Amino acid sequence: MVDKRESYTKEDLLASSRGELFGPQGPQLPAPNMLMMDRVVKMTEDGGKYGKGFVEAELDITPDQWFFGCHFIGDPVMPGCLGLDAMWQLVGFYLGWLGGEGKGRALGVGEVKFSGQVLPTAKKVTYRIHFKRVINRRLVMGIADGEVLVDGQHIYAADELKVGLFKDASSF
């Protein structure tokens, strides 16, 4: 039985990274440092811009986060690819929440637009994922649009985020 709540704590997300939240066959989130969210604040099966599912998650920002120390020295900024990866992570998490089984793999993205950045002075990053389609056949796949906000300001968007679940990812 899938643990299908509307919100999840950091402890829940860490359980997902160990394969304990959605069962042994369900998709896992990555472990820290690559886990790019601290909590999921809302999940619905029929919400979002397209009425086909919605996820909202948050990451608390502190100046001592690992990426600020190396990207870039003297000009610290969160790499945009980490925000993109967070959106893929959330698409896979949603597929597990729906009961999908397999190992999650990012399959692509249509277009990504950056219009801002995450600096060490920021307090919170918010991710919003709007599902366009979920395919639940031999291949389980989610297709969604996503947006990233920092302290309430929209800073980037991605369309056509695609994540698939694979029973055997060795041949992927």
UniProtKB/Swiss-Prot annotation:
Gene Ontology MF terms in the entry: (3R)-hydroxyacyl-[acyl-carrier-protein] dehydratase activity; trans-2-decenoyl-acyl-carrier-protein isomerase activity
The enzyme's E.C. designation: 4.2.1.59, 5.3.3.14
Pathway: Lipid metabolism; fatty acid biosynthesis
Location in the cell: Cytoplasm
Catalytic residues (UniProt): 71
Keywords in alphabetical order: Cytoplasm, Fatty acid biosynthesis, Fatty acid metabolism, Isomerase, Lipid biosynthesis, Lipid metabolism, Lyase
Single GO BP term: unsaturated fatty acid biosynthetic process
GO cellular component, one term: cytoplasm
Assembly mode: Homodimer.
Protein known as: 3-hydroxydecanoyl-[acyl-carrier-protein] dehydratase
Species name: Pectobacterium atrosepticum (strain SCRI 1043 / ATCC BAA-672)
Phylogenetic classification of the source organism: Bacteria, Pseudomonadati, Pseudomonadota, Gammaproteobacteria, Enterobacterales
